UniProtKB/Swiss-Prot annotation:
Record's GO cellular component terms: extracellular region
Name of the featured protein: Phylloseptin-H9
Family according to the record: Belongs to the frog skin active peptide (FSAP) family. Phylloseptin subfamily.
Compositional bias per record (Acidic residues), positions renumbered to this chain: 30-41
Tissue spec. comment: Expressed by the skin glands.
Pfam families named in the record: FSAP_sig_propep
Subcellular location as annotated: Secreted
Modification sites for Leucine amide: 65
UniProt keyword terms in alphabetical order: Amidation, Amphibian defense peptide, Antimicrobial, Cleavage on pair of basic residues, Secreted, Signal
Amino acid sequence: MAFLKKSLFLVLFLGLVSLSICEEEKRETEEEENDQEEDDKSEEKRFLGLLPSIVSGAVSLVKKLG
């Protein structure tokens, strides 16, 4: 009977460790996805911030040529 208890505790412990590792990997993956989304948003903001100066430069170039 003691052998069965030890085996059961060992199985439960290993299952708990495995579950903990899976949860940690899942959390890391979610953090990486969030970081990627934030990077994409900041790049979009930078591009949109430059857009007015690009447009005004193009307009002034067209005025000089036309």
